[in-house]
Amino acid sequence: MEEFRYDTQLLIEGADLDEDAINDYFRLHSKGDCLLTVGDEDLIKIHFHTNEPWKVLEYCASLGEIYDIVVEDMVRQSKGLHG
């Protein structure tokens, strides 16, 4: 069984986004793994496995507009079900 159930992915569009600061925030304030934050000051892609995807969305929405949001249940996927 997966330790972290939800594969959470999204884009953040904003101004003066800081990839390193976003990465540091998740490492310090969120439980999860497979964290990926890539982009530039205008657009950041987030990928994170967590049990609390709503917290990821809430934080990212505080930074700018969020879109292309995907939250997949990896436990369901491992059972051959739609995530």
What are these regions (language model features)?
Residues 1-83:
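N-terminal loops that bind phosphate or other acidic moieties
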